[in-house]
């Protein structure tokens, strides 16, 4: 539920007024969908407000550490504040800086890595520089994001991305990693998928395909969407 400058979930609140990209469906879907089985350490690349990291903290065991990396100073400060205000402050860690620099310096591997990366090709700049950086694929391509994530992944670990459908297809074709899960996200029943949730591993496995429709033909939330997100949304 929206509340002033933020968004209130069942077990935590997100302030995002100083973040370029606000709480949105893409991040919520990824935070609810990512498989955390056998996870002892989790990394959120480009954490923004800290939304996905907090969702994964809620879903994971008490001994699991969650690290978020954010390059925008204002967003990083707000994510840190959101972490500290949550029930899981003792196992949430914020790292300020570029994800490529973090990968070179952190000296740690992670069991699960999540990313909701920028997805618009560089074109006409947004008026707000921070929002421009958050939305556009400028400094790093999606393939580079995935390559960085792979360098930080344990041998049996999993990387989870949310992307526009066409860009997800391109990413699958460009990587040597194996896509082990794919969920095509349909905004409304009868329409084509606009988003895709993808999971990658170093180990070869068959891809498990699924679909998720958010709204039915009468603009009501579908049962599958409610079941996926009911531990977070107040309205469910």
Curated annotation (Swiss-Prot):
<keyword id="KW-0808">Transferase</keyword>
<dbReference type="GO" id="GO:0008033">
    <property type="term" value="P:tRNA processing"/>
</dbReference>
<dbReference type="InterPro" id="IPR007848">
    <property type="entry name" value="Small_mtfrase_dom"/>
</dbReference>
<keyword id="KW-0489">Methyltransferase</keyword>
<dbReference type="InterPro" id="IPR029063">
    <property type="entry name" value="SAM-dependent_MTases_sf"/>
</dbReference>
<dbReference type="GO" id="GO:0016430">
    <property type="term" value="F:tRNA (adenine-N6)-methyltransferase activity"/>
</dbReference>
<comment type="similarity">
    <text>Belongs to the methyltransferase superfamily. tRNA (adenine-N(6)-)-methyltransferase family.</text>
</comment>
<keyword id="KW-0819">tRNA processing</keyword>
<dbReference type="Pfam" id="PF05175">
    <property type="entry name" value="MTS"/>
</dbReference>
<protein>
    <recommendedName>
        <fullName>tRNA1(Val) (adenine(37)-N6)-methyltransferase</fullName>
        <ecNumber>2.1.1.223</ecNumber>
    </recommendedName>
</protein>
<dbReference type="GO" id="GO:0003676">
    <property type="term" value="F:nucleic acid binding"/>
</dbReference>
<dbReference type="GO" id="GO:0005737">
    <property type="term" value="C:cytoplasm"/>
</dbReference>
<dbReference type="InterPro" id="IPR050210">
    <property type="entry name" value="tRNA_Adenine-N(6)_MTase"/>
</dbReference>
<dbReference type="InterPro" id="IPR002052">
    <property type="entry name" value="DNA_methylase_N6_adenine_CS"/>
</dbReference>
<keyword id="KW-0949">S-adenosyl-L-methionine</keyword>
<dbReference type="GO" id="GO:0032259">
    <property type="term" value="P:methylation"/>
</dbReference>
<keyword id="KW-0963">Cytoplasm</keyword>
<dbReference type="InterPro" id="IPR022882">
    <property type="entry name" value="tRNA_adenine-N6_MeTrfase"/>
</dbReference>
<comment type="function">
    <text>Specifically methylates the adenine in position 37 of tRNA(1)(Val) (anticodon cmo5UAC).</text>
</comment>
């Amino acid at each position: 539920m929206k509340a002033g400058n933020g968004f209130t979930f069942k077990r935590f609140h997100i302030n995002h007024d100083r973040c370029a990209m606000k709480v949105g469906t893409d991040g919520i879907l990824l935070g609810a969908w990512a498989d955390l089985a056998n996870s002892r350490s989790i990394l959120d690349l480009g954490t923004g407000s800290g939304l996905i990291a907090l969702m994964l903290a809620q879903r994971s065991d008490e001994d699991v550490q969650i690290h978020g990396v954010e390059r925008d100073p204002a967003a990083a400060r707000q994510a840190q504040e959101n972490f500290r205000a949550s029930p899981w402050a003792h196992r949430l860690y914020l790292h300020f800086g570029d994800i490529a620099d973090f990968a070179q310096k952190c000296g740690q591997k992670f069991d699960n890595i999540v990313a909701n990366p920028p997805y618009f090709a560089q074109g006409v700049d947004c008026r707000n520089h921070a929002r421009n950086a958050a939305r556009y694929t400028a400094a790093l391509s999606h393939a580079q994001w995935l390559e960085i994530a792979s360098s930080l992944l344990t041998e049996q670990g999993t990387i989870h991305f949310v992307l526009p459908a066409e860009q997800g297809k391109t990413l699958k074709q460009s990587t040597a990693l194996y896509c082990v899960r794919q969920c095509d996200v349909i905004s409304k029943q009868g329409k084509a998928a606009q988003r895709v949730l993808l999971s990658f591993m170093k180990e070869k496995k068959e891809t498990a395909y699924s679909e998720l429709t958010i709204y039915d033909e009468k603009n009501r939330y579908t049962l599958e969407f409610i079941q996926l997100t009911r531990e977070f949304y107040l309205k469910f």
